[in-house]
């Protein structure tokens, strides 16, 4: 089965009444590492810290809508780092770029996984205050949204939801906090995570973030963990806000290491090698199993099928996750069409989400009626 999809403004085809937690969203782990390194850091970054080859604008263009951003504190600004290695991207510039992308494409929305990269701090004990001040800037207030359990696609269009792993204040300035995050392969702990917003808005969260696969059997454990979460997420039914269950399923990890000052640490090729296994596993899962939501999948080398000597299949995976939405959301016949354009009579789309001008007989399509509703349709002649 082909799972390719058109990435441009792909969220415009999502039904408005869909709960946000039900959308399958492709994401980029350490998203800024494809945008280059700070002066003098090219060698270190390319060997140890690169997880992406595409820049932030290129990731957006290929369909990425979840961004893992890891700010740290410098004297006059906040920088995006991967560990000790600084990228060339200031956090403020990344927010500006993403907001500009949303303003230019108001059908789309973004989820940000935010994590304080403490190893990169050049100023101590300043993160909490600085992050609050930055998130309060007037420049992007039109783009940011507070978390609610019952958020739907229609609420999110043109918006960015920032969810922080660090509790930088009693309540989030905007967005939400992650709670009980775990990198362990312990199913009870993985299902005990939460997303906590203002005014007691709390949603259940299942998380898989097993990040070190370089030991013998590590990759196999990672793939098994990914598939276990996929089994859970694709079979979980959300018919009301009480059933909302978020999922963050990391494809990212490193399976090879390099030595730095006598210490074995993650390597860029380690992220590449791991991706060859995890990306293939997810692509196979989506093509071989009944469709259903996969949540947010954060991957390395997103949008890139070949990185160096490694067959990462990152473009194929992004397209498969996008296309997956239109395999299961088409079954929801009572949801309204997401398009902000005037609905047309009998507009037909393939199950992968591509509009069809001349449909073939004896094939299944998604029909968007004049009432804006989506239904499956089999053409018999």
Language-model features, listed with the residues they occupy:
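Loop/turn elements at helix/coil->beta-strand transitions in domains of secreted/extracellular proteins
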Residues: 62-67, 105-111, 140-141, 156-160, ...
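Acidic, His- and aromatic-enriched active-site or binding-groove loops in soluble protein domains
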Residues: 90-94, 132-148
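C-terminal active-site rim and adjoining tail of enzyme catalytic domains
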Residues: 163-165, 169-331
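Long, acidic (Asp/Glu-rich), low-complexity accessory segments flanking structured domains
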Residues: 2-62, 75-109, 254-331
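Residue-level detector of functionally pivotal "anchor" positions at catalytic/ligand-binding pockets or at interdomain
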Residues: 329-355
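Active-site groove signature of glycoside hydrolases
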Residues: 73, 105-121
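C-terminal tail/sorting-segment detector
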Residues: 364-381
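Conserved, mostly hydrophobic/aromatic
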Residues: 59, 70, 112, 162, ...
């Amino acid at each position: 089965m082909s799972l390719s999809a058109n990435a441009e403004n792909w969220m415009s085809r999502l039904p408005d009444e869909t709960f946000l937690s039900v959308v399958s969203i492709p994401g980029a782990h350490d998203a800024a590492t494809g945008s280059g390194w700070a002066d003098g850091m090219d060698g270190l970054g390319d060997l140890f810290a690169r997880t992406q080859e595409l820049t932030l604008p290129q990731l957006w263009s290929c369909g990425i809508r979840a961004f893992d951003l890891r700010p740290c504190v410098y004297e006059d600004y906040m920088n995006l780092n991967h560990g000790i290695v600084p990228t060339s991207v200031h956090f403020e510039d990344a927010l500006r770029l993403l907001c500009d992308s949303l303003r230019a494409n108001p059908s789309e929305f973004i989820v940000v996984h935010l994590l304080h990269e403490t190893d990169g701090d050049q100023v101590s004990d300043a993160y909490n205050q600085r992050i609050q001040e930055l998130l309060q800037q007037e420049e992007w207030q039109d783009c940011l949204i507070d978390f609610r359990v019952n958020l739907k696609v229609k609420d999110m269009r043109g918006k960015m939801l920032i969810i922080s792993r660090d509790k930088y204040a009693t309540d989030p300035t905007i967005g939400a906090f992650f709670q009980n995050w775990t990198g362990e392969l312990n199913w009870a702990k993985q299902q005990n995570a939460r997303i906590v917003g203002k005014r007691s808005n709390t949603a259940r969260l299942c998380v898989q973030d097993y990040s070190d696969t370089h030991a013998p059997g590590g990759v196999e454990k990672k793939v098994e963990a990914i598939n276990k979460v996929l089994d859970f997420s694709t079979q979980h039914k959300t018919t009301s806000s009480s059933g909302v269950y978020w999922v963050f399923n990391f494809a990212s990890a490193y399976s090879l290491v390099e030595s730095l000052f006598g210490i074995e640490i993650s390597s860029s090729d380690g992220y590449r090698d791991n991706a060859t296994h995890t990306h293939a596993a997810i692509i196979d899962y989506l093509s071989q199993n009944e469709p259903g939501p996969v949540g947010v999948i954060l991957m390395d080398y997103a949008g890139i099928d070949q990185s160096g000597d490694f067959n990462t299949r990152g473009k194929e995976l992004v397209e498969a996750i996008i296309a997956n939405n239109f395999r299961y959301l088409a079954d929801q016949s009572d949801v309204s069409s997401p398009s902000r354009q005037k609905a047309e009579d009998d507009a037909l789309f393939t199950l992968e989400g591509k509009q069809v001008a001349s449909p073939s007989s004896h094939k299944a399509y998604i029909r968007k009626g004049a009432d804006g509703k989506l239904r499956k349709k089999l053409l018999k002649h």
